Amino acid sequence: MKNRVYMLGIIIWLAQINYVNAANKIVVMNVANIFQQSAQRTEIIKQLEYEFKDRAAELEMMEHDLQTKMQTLQRDGATMTASDRNTLEKSLIAQRELFSNKAKLFQQENHARQTEERDKILDMIYKIVKNIAKKENYDIVIDTNAVVYFSSHIKDITDSVSNQMRVK
């Protein structure tokens, strides 16, 4: 009987030790914070602005031209001949449709490029996290945005990941 109580005490003690060790192998990080502060993100923003600069300028010119024609139609429409007014209206409709199509295509391509570049940065972050986790023997790495609460004894590796992002 004494041996059973003694063995039960040892089993409970070992279970508590494993629980404490498991908590030490769980870490958190803030992916959004790392992403927002990365130098790569700043570079990508500048690169994409440069890449789409000419098309954005073209769309601005088209929009300005459309507004000018619409103002002309509103201002002089009553005094124009019917054929001139009809021609201007058809021109406006065609130009507005062309502008709309170009703007939609621009937005789609810009969004696709932003997504592509964002995914590259996130992939870089995840590779760094994986390397840190392997090096430090962490079992689980959790994004702080996916957790409602975590105790202060859980290690946060956000700064370590951010520092390695600066090096790359």
Swiss-Prot record:
Tell me where the signal peptide lies: 1-22
One biological process term in Gene Ontology: protein stabilization
In residue numbers, the region (Lipopolysaccharide binding) covers 102-113
Q: What SMART domains does the entry give?
A: OmpH
Q: What is its main location?
A: periplasm
Keywords of this entry: Chaperone, Periplasm, Signal
Query: Which Gene Ontology terms cover its molecular function?
Result: unfolded protein binding
Gene Ontology annotations for the cellular component aspect, listed alphabetically: cytosol; periplasmic space
Kindly give the SUPFAM superfamilies that the UniProt entry links to this protein. Answer: OmpH-like (SSF111384)
Q: Where in the cell is it found?
A: Periplasm
* Assembly behavior: Homotrimer.
Protein task:
Molecular chaperone that interacts specifically with outer membrane proteins, thus maintaining the solubility of early folding intermediates during passage through the periplasm.
The record's similarity note reads: Belongs to the Skp family.
> Per its record, how is this protein called by name?
Chaperone protein Skp
Native source organism of the sequence = Blochmanniella floridana
Q: What does the organism's lineage look like at the top?
A: Bacteria, Pseudomonadati, Pseudomonadota, Gammaproteobacteria, Enterobacterales
Give the encoding gene's name: skp
